[in-house]
């Protein structure tokens, strides 16, 4: 498992690493939104990132089911 994580972190263009980076960004913005509830641009950014991550996960599911399972776990 750590071998795969190292491969993903070295290859920032891979779908798995993009999903991981989007997830980290969404979590960071969600924490920000917890303290700044009326930050509507942040809400919009989170929605856009969620849609992008959903599309990448769908692509990964169609192309590489093992990679999809690794990302989801």
UniProtKB/Swiss-Prot annotation:
Compartments, as annotated in UniProt: Plastid, Chloroplast
UniProt subunit comment: Part of the 30S ribosomal subunit.
Top-level taxon: Eukaryota
Keywords assigned: Chloroplast, Plastid, Ribonucleoprotein, Ribosomal protein
Record-given protein name: Small ribosomal subunit protein uS15c
Statement: the UniProt record of this protein carries the keyword Lipid metabolism: no
GO-annotated biological processes: translation
Pfam families: Ribosomal_S15 (PF00312)
GO cellular component labels: chloroplast; ribonucleoprotein complex; ribosome
Species in which this protein is naturally found: Welwitschia mirabilis
Family: Belongs to the universal ribosomal protein uS15 family.
InterPro entries according to UniProt: Ribosomal_uS15, Ribosomal_uS15_bac-type, uS15_NS1_RNA-bd_sf
GO molecular function: structural constituent of ribosome
PANTHER family hit by this protein: RIBOSOMAL PROTEIN S15, BACTERIAL AND ORGANELLAR (PTHR23321), SMALL RIBOSOMAL SUBUNIT PROTEIN US15M (PTHR23321:SF26)
Keyword Endoplasmic reticulum: no
């Amino acid at each position: 498992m750590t071998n795969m994580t190292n491969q993903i972190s070295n290859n920032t263009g891979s779908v798995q690493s993009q999903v991981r980076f989007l997830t980290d960004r969404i979590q960071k913005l969600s924490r920000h939104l917890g303290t700044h509830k009326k930050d509507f641009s942040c809400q919009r950014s989170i929605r856009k990132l969620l849609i992008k991550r959903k599309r990448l996960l769908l692509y990964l599911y169609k192309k590489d089911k093992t990679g999809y399972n690794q990302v989801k776990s």
